[in-house]
Structure formats: C-alpha cells, structure tokens
C-alpha cells in the first residue's frame, strides 16, 4: 500500500488493468484502490496479512470470485532488517522476516499459479519484488539477504515449472529506492545511500513499476526466470574509489600521482599512519595496488587535499 507496491498498483490501473490491492492497513490499501478508481481505473481492496499463507489463499479466492479469473500476481510485501552481525539476531527475528519475505512470496506464487492455471489465462505472470540484496549480499544483512536470495531462487525455479504453460515468472531487484523502508532516516543518511550508488541517486518507486508493467505485458512473453536489477548499477560490480573521469588535476605543473606517493612516503607522520593500517605498505608495491580503497580513509585522516588524494588513488589503480 506504500512505496513500490503502491506505484505498481497505480501504474497497472492507469494502463487499463483490473487491480486488487492487498495490505494489512485498511486505510492505506483502500486509499490506493480509491485513487485508481478516481482516475477511471478498476480496483478493489482486500485487507490481507501477507505473512500468512492462509490469508493469501483467501485473497486469491476472493479475487477470482470478484473478477472471475486471475491473470497475474505481484508479490511485493516485505520488511527490512539489518545492520547487525548474524550472531546478534534473535530466532524471533529470523521467524519474523522469513514469514513475510519468504513464506508470503511462496504463498502468492503457489495460490496465484493455481488460479492462473485454472483460469486458462493467456499470458499469465508472476512478479516477485526481491532486492539487489538477493543478488549481492551486504554486510549486516544476513537475514534480509537470505530471504531475497530465496525469492530469486524460487523465481527462477518456478519459471522452469510454468514456462510451457505460458506463465512468466520474474523478479524485480530494486537497489536504494525512496520508500518507507528507510523510515525517517536523516538527510545525511539518504545522501550516503545516493553517493554509494554509481548513478549517484536513489531510485523512484515508479521506475520499478515501469518494469513491472513491461513484465506483465504481452511484450515480455519470452522473458521468464529473470532477476532484473533496478539499481543504478549498484550490483554491476565493485566501485573503485578513484574517478575514471580523471579531471584535469595534473596539469598545473608540479603535482603528479607518482610524486604524490613519494611525498606521502617521505612524510614521517604519514608513514606512521600508513604503517598502522597497512604494515609493510611503504616498501610493498603489491600492497599499494591491493589497498587503494583504504587510502581513502588514510587520506582523510591526513587531511590530504582532494586533488592529491585523487591523483594518489589513480596511481594506486595502475601500479
């Protein structure tokens, strides 16, 4: 009823699809359905606890009773939980996050697939909203990542089950997206997430909705078993601290990357800090190549000017 789920429901409604909204919050869920209808769409709301398989079965049954058939299911409900080493989680945390993020998706797929098959719908679809954490695990996110890896795995396996019946099964894997999962995070935290992404911004829920609409459409009938990131290249690979753009910082005569390294190694205070983090660094070319990332921290501690730090990091990349 919020964030990505709301954006998908509204996008589907605006594009002529009959939509059944399901959420725990009656107020929020009904507001989404009413908004779709106010714009000329066709939508109803059914209050549902999406962490319970029995509730999802009832949701599917009511949907078929109201509309006569079911063409597709989007399983979006989920909760975040993280920032904690695995051993600090409680068993109750495990049960809570798996009941919604995994069991809820399983039930949506199970009862959704049954209803689609019984409806003899042409072009049926199952779309699961997973996460970039289901493609690339993140530190402190053991439980959340496990649930999302599970969603991606179920998606791919189910695609094999239903391909011959014309039912596509795909997962959308959002990266940092401006939704309520971030709660009341301060602006500085949001800026950090944006800066951590290669695209240097957070995603909008509507960008995930656009992909969901495509996957539900006739244009995507041969796309199945895919886990598609919507993440501004967050999962594409490791980011180097240095800039590939190489701004013109080496043309003012004196500064160049190799001399910057030499100057740093000649500074006793700098050498002490470097040795603290990276023993043997000053005389070890392989260490210089391997630990460019750590130099960002060292440079900040030493108060290096940004231009010198960039030059240094570029040199490390090429050692």
Regions found by a protein language model. Give the residues of each.
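C-terminal helical subdomain
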Residues: 171, 192-223, 230-232
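Active-site helix of classical SDR
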Residues: 109, 147, 155
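Conserved glycine-rich Rossmann-like NAD(P)H-binding loop of the short-chain dehydrogenase/reductase
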Residues: 15-31
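Short, small/polar-rich loop/turn modules that mediate ligand/substrate recognition or access, typified
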Residues: 163, 168, 223-225
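Substrate-binding pocket helix/loop in short-chain dehydrogenase/reductase
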Residues: 84-86, 93-96, 182, 193
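Residue(s) in the substrate-gating loop at a strand-loop-helix junction
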Residues: 131
């Amino acid at each position: 009823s919020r964030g990505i789920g709301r954006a998908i429901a509204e996008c589907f409604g605006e594009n002529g699809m009959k939509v059944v909204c399901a959420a725990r919050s009656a107020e929020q869920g009904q507001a989404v359905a009413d908004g779709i209808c106010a714009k000329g769409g066709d939508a109803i709301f059914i209050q549902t606890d999406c962490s319970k398989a029995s509730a999802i079965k009832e949701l599917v049954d009511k949907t078929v009773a109201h509309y006569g058939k079911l063409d597709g299911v989007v399983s979006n409900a989920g909760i975040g939980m993280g920032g904690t080493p695995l051993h600090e989680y409680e068993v109750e945390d495990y049960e809570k996050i798996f009941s919604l993020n995994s069991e809820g998706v399983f039930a949506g797929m199970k009862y959704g697939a049954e209803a689609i098959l019984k409806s003899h719908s042409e072009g049926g679809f199952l779309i699961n909203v997973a996460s970039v954490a289901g493609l690339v695990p993140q530190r402190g996110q053991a439980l959340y990542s496990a649930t999302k890896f599970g969603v991606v795995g179920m998606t791919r396996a189910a695609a094999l089950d239903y391909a011959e019946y014309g039912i596509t099964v795909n997962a959308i894997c959002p990266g940092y997206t401006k939704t309520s999962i971030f709660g009341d995070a301060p602006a500085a935290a949001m800026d950090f997430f944006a800066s951590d992404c290669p695209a240097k911004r957070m995603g909008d829920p509507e960008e995930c909705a656009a992909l969901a609409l495509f996957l539900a459409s006739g244009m995507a009938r041969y796309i199945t078993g895919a886990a598609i990131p919507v993440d501004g290249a967050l999962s594409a690979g490791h980011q180097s601290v240095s800039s590939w753009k190489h701004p013109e910082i080496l043309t003012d005569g004196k500064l160049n990357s190799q001399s910057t390294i030499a100057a740093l190694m000649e500074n006793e205070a700098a050498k002490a800090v470097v040795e603290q983090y990276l023993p043997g660094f000053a005389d070890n070319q392989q260490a210089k190549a391997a630990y460019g990332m750590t130099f960002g921290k060292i440079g900040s501690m030493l108060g290096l000017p940004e231009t010198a730090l960039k030059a240094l990091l570029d040199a490390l990349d090429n050692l």
